[in-house]
């Protein structure tokens, strides 16, 4: 891998924009490209599901059942990247170039290790995974074909995710956005070609959807590699004489592991919800899967906002600028709540229209319309919790994020859903989301009050 040493002045003698630019335009500058990138990322699964829904409802259900393990894969990639992002930004804020470089190099090494793990999972674990959720052999086989391709060829998604985090950590979110767009456009173009059998029956249906997805991911990965080696002078990456550093990896996962665990908790929640809903019907599972695809268009922009927010907070925390830290948090919460309000209005007032994108049958509409209207009530509270979760991570307190996530999804949402399912009405199950969000926001505010007192306030002295 080539280095960037020939480009511009080294980071030690330059002040990064995260320490000098006014907060509001800086947050928008970093976040808007990341928000677009995250929306584009949401397209990967959504586009697959839209085209697959026109094949059959069983194919849509299969892709929905695959989501839990896919989310684990994303969790590992993004969580590792979160650790790299926060530590790299903090190192640059402290003017510690050698630590910044070591963080980047070890992050890339970890992404390759993650690929190796999921390669093995793709070869060995597909059948037990799907048959644990359904006894329908048609749904299971369609899911196996889809998910095995995604896991075995997961090098693309892990490389792309890490590359994007390196760009975001140094303020180059526009380049991250471009790489996402390239991957998504390739996926969108290839999806109908493969899914509907234009390249042969062997690559049709769910198999074709997976092939189109991984090709798009590899294209995005190629772009991030190019941008980081040619257009990112804040880090100098060289694997000549590289040895994995247990200390650097430990620092990365001190921040990133709670993020991984939080998203894996989300996978356990979706897996559990699938089991609860399958007791009603496969159509209920398909509706839940469609909801998760659709809600990603509401939540992903906030995750993008957080990706822009985290390096600002980490950098200014390292530079001992508490005024900039607190202003960043306040602005991020305001923007997040605005996004959530827009999402609430769409789900509340146009559920039939959004469900129709997935070729929803009358049975799906009967379950899906009330589901969308009930579930979206928790959007009004979720914006604050999501932003504060990333604030905890940026300030090195990711364990608080993990505690909130585990309590919300495993100790409140799933038990509430199971109890409500005992009423015999699937419509009652959806209220579990609002109940869980009330608990989540109360815990998040309590933890933030503690962090403000012990971590942010001392920076004023």
Predicted feature locations:
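Residue-level signal for short hydrophobic patches within transmembrane helices
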Residues: 20, 24-43, 47, 69-76, ...
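Helix-terminus/linker motif at the lipid-water interface of multi-pass membrane proteins
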Residues: 39, 43-61, 130-137, 193-204, ...
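Transmembrane helical elements of multi-pass membrane transporters/channels
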Residues: 29-48, 149, 160, 183, ...
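Hydrophobic transmembrane alpha-helices of multi-pass small-molecule transporters
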Residues: 72-75, 119, 187-192, 221-225, ...
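Short runs within selected transmembrane alpha-helices of multi-pass transporters and secretion channels
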Residues: 81, 150-168, 176-184, 209-224, ...
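Structural signal for membrane-spanning alpha-helices in multi-pass inner-membrane proteins
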Residues: 122, 165, 191, 195, ...
